[in-house]
Amino acid sequence: MILSFFHDRDEQQASYRYRGSIPSKYLDIPMGDESADVWVLSKITKASPALLAKAHRLGKRVIADVCDAHLSLPYYREVIEKADAITTPTSLLAEFIWEDLGRMATVIDDPYEFEEILPHVNGKNLLWFGHATNYSGLAMFREALAEYPLRMVSNIEGFIPWSKETMREEFSKADIVLLPDSAPTKSCNRAVEAIRQGCFVVATPHPSLDGLPGIWVGDFLKGVAWASAHPQEANERLMKSQAYVRVRFSPARVANAWKTLALACASSSAAAISPGKAGSTSIANEPVTAPTL
């Protein structure tokens, strides 16, 4: 077996799904298989240095998948410095790793998780979902959004608890998904899932949203007002978003990127892997051909 993903949490963690279980499913491989030639550490934790050392003792190659910008943490730095290859979900995080630690990283997108639903914008029902650490971005707009029905899914006490089935239900009720300010190194997976589920995305500017067609990025309140007042146009734009997402973020495409990198990692010296511009290469930089309206 060429590769296996290692993650010490469960599907409640987004990184477990996007950076482990989903590509594993499409490659038809088990997670945590120590017989694999290449081990992907899908979330760096305090236990990761020991796991990396074990892999190297067994003659395995290690890909460290860096999903958070915790580059000052000693165990993060140790894993990044000793891994045979580095991956990240965003080009900005790859640039930070290059600038701080001098390691090149390959950018591999998060795949989509949810099935595609026809666009269904037909009102002003709002949905926000995310970790408690991202709530501050929404909080600054709460008063200005008081006239809109707003539902919130999070691990914050009193909010709707997250589950995949809950998200399906909440997406089906929502017209517009809100993506206010969040950490600049985060991926666009929340926008992708909202698009897949037929909701129009209104967001403040974010690096990961660059090039994603059809969504509203800019004046946040103006975007909410426009989408709620122009449902037909919002749905037409959403169809463009879905066509793009269907190709770029397909689990099969992302899984193939992991397999390609693992094959290179298994057969090449670490210095030869992914020497792209600014320390990164990216499947996101490959042309994406998708139908447009």
Residue ranges of predicted features:
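Conserved catalytic-core segment of nucleotide-activated headgroup transferases in glycan assembly
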Residues: 8-23, 114-116, 122-167, 190
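Extended catalytic core of nucleotide-activated donor transferases of GT-like folds
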Residues: 26-97
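Hydrophobic acceptor-binding patch used for acceptor engagement in glycosyltransferases
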Residues: 39, 86, 174-178, 200-201
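A charged, aromatic-enriched C-terminal amphipathic alpha-helix characteristic of glycosyltransferases
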Residues: 115, 123, 232-267, 276, ...
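Nucleotide-sugar-dependent
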Residues: 133, 161-165, 169, 175-196, ...
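N-terminal pre-catalytic "stem/leader" segment of glycosyltransferase-like enzymes
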Residues: 1-49, 251, 269, 291
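Donor nucleotide-sugar binding/catalytic pocket of nucleotide-sugar-dependent glycosyltransferases
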Residues: 84-98, 102-117
